[in-house]
Amino acid sequence: AYAEALGVDIDQLILSQPNTGEEGLQIADTLISSGAIDIVVVDSVAVLVPRAEIEGEMGDSHVGLQARLMSQALRKLSGTIAKTKTIAIFINQIREKVGVMFGN
């Protein structure tokens, strides 16, 4: 309803809520490679959690996993994006203070 009020044609909207970062980026790659879409928005990069982190134990160290996942994905996607002329938007969050929302 809100998207429609903003002018989004929801019949043309593809919404995906993947379980892992790898799954989400694979879906983006598949859609971009198909040439059937004009724009893909990943919201948010912060929740593209690597499979190893999801399957690991609480407290395990996963230093750099998300950075490596994004680096690899962007290297792979950049060529496909250029060929298909698809617009790709990646939204992320910056948190300076844990627990603070909306600039408070």
Curated annotation (Swiss-Prot):
Protein name, per record: Protein RecA
Compartment(s): Cytoplasm
Family: Belongs to the RecA family.
Pfam families named among the record's database cross-references: RecA
Gene Ontology annotations of biological process type: DNA recombination; DNA repair; SOS response
Recorded name of the encoding gene: recA
Organism: Lactobacillus delbrueckii subsp. bulgaricus
PROSITE patterns xref list: RECA_2
Keywords: ATP-binding, Cytoplasm, DNA damage, DNA recombination, DNA repair, DNA-binding, Nucleotide-binding, SOS response
